[in-house]
UniProtKB/Swiss-Prot annotation:
This is Cold shock-like protein CspA. GO terms for cellular component: cytosol. Keywords: Activator, Cytoplasm, DNA-binding, Transcription, Transcription regulation. InterPro entries: Cold_shock_CspA, CSD, CSD_CS, CSP_DNA-bd, NA-bd_OB-fold. It is found in: Cytoplasm. The gene is cspA. It comes from Bordetella pertussis (strain Tohama I / ATCC BAA-589 / NCTC 13251). Its main location: cytoplasm. Coiled coil: none annotated. PANTHER family: COLD SHOCK DOMAIN PROTEIN 2, COLD SHOCK DOMAIN-CONTAINING PROTEIN 4. Residues 4-64 form the CSD domain.
Amino acid sequence: METGVVKWFNAEKGYGFITPEAGGKDLFAHFSEIQANGFKSLEENQRVSFVTAMGPKGPQATKIQIL
């Protein structure tokens, strides 16, 4: 598991980007990868853990958990 900070997240569109704390490019984050019950959304500057995986358009955050 890696950690990072939510750069931005659009709850209406269901996606945003996470900046990894270890450095590197921002990662795409889709609401379907958020490990939570109910309405799945993230807030700007929120700390999260995640796993980087290859998505259809390149690396993306999966198994996102709010810390």
